Amino acid sequence: MISRRKFIQNTGAGLFLTAIPYSTNALNNIKKYELTAKKAKHSFEKNQNKTDLWLFNNNCPGPLITANKNDVIEIIFNNQLDEPSAVHWHGIRNINSMDGVPVLSQPLVEPGESFVYRFPVKDAGTFWYHAHNKAWEQVTRGLYGPLIVSDNDQLKEKNDILVLADDWLLNENLQMDVSSLGNLHDWSHAGRYGNRLTINGVFKPNIEVFSSGQARLRFLNTANARVLKFMLNDDIYFRVIATDGSPCNPFKTNKIVLGPGQRIDILIDETTKLKHLKEVSTGNELVAATFEPKNQSVSVLDFNKKPYYPFPSLNNAKVINIHMQGGAMGNLKSAIFNGERREFRN
């Protein structure tokens, strides 16, 4: 571990202050980025109060990191927080020493220090990165961002759309309810839920899509506890083509469910069908985003990827039943409220 000042003196890293790749080695395909964790302010919607958050490079979500399959990614991580941190590369089949697990695979990056992550990306898919010390607080405050590995360099030329979702527990002034961070009641039950939903760091954004052709939507749930459920428009069907960064045998559905940290890629055959994205996990339909067509068409997307690994035989599989009960009171089926019994299960 080295200090920020010494690191800059030795490497000249002070010249590179954004998360945009600042050089590419043609022989080794090294994509270089710099991420700085610090306190920052962010507006979830125009003309509203700015919220105090902890962010990478002052962005919510953090900057998009892109690479091609078999590239090497090099990230200079600078910690400008008042407490230690580290960065985990969620879903990447990584080198153990670069996986970002404090104490186990690396020392904590102390305030004012820097750490260089350098690892190959072996798989194309949808991934993300996030703080990995006190994640229940640091990730909740905004320290995360998307990481997309492509099979080619045509990511920006395609109807390839990121849908990064998070829920935030905010007060009437749009400030975080920091008093609830680390709440043991939440931990022992279903976790700390938020009361406001963002897509790509914004309340109910307009998402641009090409006016015709296919579209790939990359869904990513960065909430720390909430299981999210999405549908498009009024229940139109689409194809799931990848889960957790790996292509799958495509199948049709009209809703997707994402647990915390989960990613699902879907394919829409015709973007003219896209109107609204709705979150429906509570039983109510909440419009999370609106799709806005732009006058450009796109050719057929290349999504016919085979799963990376063959499906194992289940002939001699050992069956293990896992009961997902949701923590304390997870088995509660009903309760009496105001003298009336209310059922919790349909």
Model regions: which residues?
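N-terminal export signals
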Residues: 6-26
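Extended terminal and domain-junction accessory segments
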Residues: 27-34, 139-171, 246-346
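Extracytoplasmic beta-sandwich strand-turn segments characteristic of Greek-key/jelly-roll folds
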Residues: 60, 65-67, 89-123, 203-205, ...
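Hydrophobic or amphipathic alpha-helical targeting/insertion segments
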Residues: 117, 121-150
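Acidic-aromatic/histidine active-site loop/patch
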Residues: 160-213, 220-223, 327, 333-337
